Swiss-Prot record:
GO terms for molecular function: inorganic diphosphate phosphatase activity; manganese ion binding. This is Probable manganese-dependent inorganic pyrophosphatase. Mn(2+) 2 binds at residues 15, 75, 97, 149. Keywords: Cytoplasm, Hydrolase, Manganese, Metal-binding. It is found in: Cytoplasm. Its cofactor is Mn(2+). Belongs to the PPase class C family. Its EC number is 3.6.1.1. InterPro entries: DDH_dom (IPR001667), DHH_sf (IPR038763), DHHA2 (IPR004097), DHHA2_dom_sf (IPR038222), Mn-dep_inorganic_PyrPase (IPR022934). The gene is ppaC. SUPFAM superfamilies: DHH phosphoesterases. It catalyses: diphosphate + H2O = 2 phosphate + H(+). HAMAP family: PPase_C (MF_00207). Binds 2 manganese ions per subunit.
Length: 309
């Protein structure tokens, strides 16, 4: 049987990795020869989850067409966030919870996108719909994805469906969602030992906003100053990325997991759009973004609107 690769976006977060594992497992149970892979390094937060539930991380690939003809995308749909040669393969399915942009296919496909906080929430439904029991380890990974995407249920992207799914999955996994979740988020907020290049690419995504090419990277921290003490070095590596990719804006967002506020570091010729979007003034290229924790709901649509205004 021909193999199908299942993967999340480049610079994968916990949902991208864990949903690839969970959906590949469901597809295997349903008779498909599916393998989860990843398009980037595994973060400290994700590694904590994998270690805790004793699951091996997926192997790394940059391109897929040399291996398979068909792929399944989870936690993304935009071409620039996917495998480098995504145009050379057929996308069979997409399971996602983001905006739909820069995506088209030549054939009809199974496309499931729901306005929930996490792909794993959708997968929890799909396991039930197909009558497949979720293994304890996989339930733990799916729970980890929901906790990560919802910042332990505090993000505005978090829905009642996400909370309900997390409670169900925690029961299967045999953990207390709140205690485990805080441990996991703290592991993810430990940025010690990371280079500046790693910091700005840990969780970075490119977007087309009107005519502007924008990259938004986000890291979580227990204290934003722990990251911003390196601002001069960060600006240097960000400026290099802006030049290399021809970006109009690179927004580096440092989110405080205790206060649920963020600080944005904006570099690029369109940095002023951040000021317009949030009604703030950039001082030394930074501004506090009060109550902003979600790239998907509080940054991408706000900036997109500002660029198109």
């Amino acid at each position: 049987m021909e193999k199908v690769l299942v993967f999340g976006h480049k610079n994968p977060d916990t949902d991208a990795i864990c949903s690839a594992i969970a959906y590949a497992e469901l597809k295997k149970e349903l008779g498909m020869n599916a393998e989860p892979v990843r398009l980037g390094e595994i973060s400290g937060e994700t590694q904590f989850a994998l270690d805790y539930f004793k699951v091996e991380g997926p192997r790394f690939v940059e391109t897929v067409a040399s291996e398979v003809d068909n792929v399944i995308l989870v936690d993304h749909n935009e071409r620039q966030q996917s495998a480098n040669d995504i145009e050379s393969v057929r996308v069979l399915e997409v399971i996602d919870h983001h905006r739909i942009a820069n995506f088209e296919t030549s054939d009809p496909i199974y496309y499931r996108c729901e306005p929930v906080g996490c792909t794993a929430t959708i997968l929890n439904k799909m396991y039930k719909e197909n009558g497949v029991t979720i293994r304890k380890e996989v339930a733990g990974l799916m729970l980890s994805a929901i906790i990560s995407d919802s910042l332990l249920f505090k993000s505005p992207t978090c829905t009642e469906q996400d909370v309900a799914a997390a409670r169900e999955l925690a029961q299967i996994a045999g953990v207390d969602a709140d205690n485990y979740g805080l441990e996991m988020l703290k592991a993810g907020a430990d940025l010690s030992g990371k280079t500046m290049e790693q910091l700005i690419s840990l969780d970075a995504k490119e977007f087309q906003m009107g005519n502007a090419k924008v990259e938004i990277a986000q890291v979580n921290a227990v204290d934003t100053n722990d990251v911003l003490v390196h601002q001069a070095e960060l600006e240097k590596v960000i400026s290099a990325v802006v030049e290399e990719k021809g970006l109009d804006l690179f927004l580096f967002v440092v989110t405080d997991i205790l206060t649920n506020d963020s600080v944005g570091l904006a570099i690029g010729k369109a940095a002023n759009v951040v000021e317009k979007a949030y009604n703030v003034s950039l001082e030394n290229n930074t501004a506090t973004l009060k109550g902003v924790v979600s790239r998907k709901k509080q940054i991408v649509p706000v900036l997109t609107e500002a660029f198109q205004a």
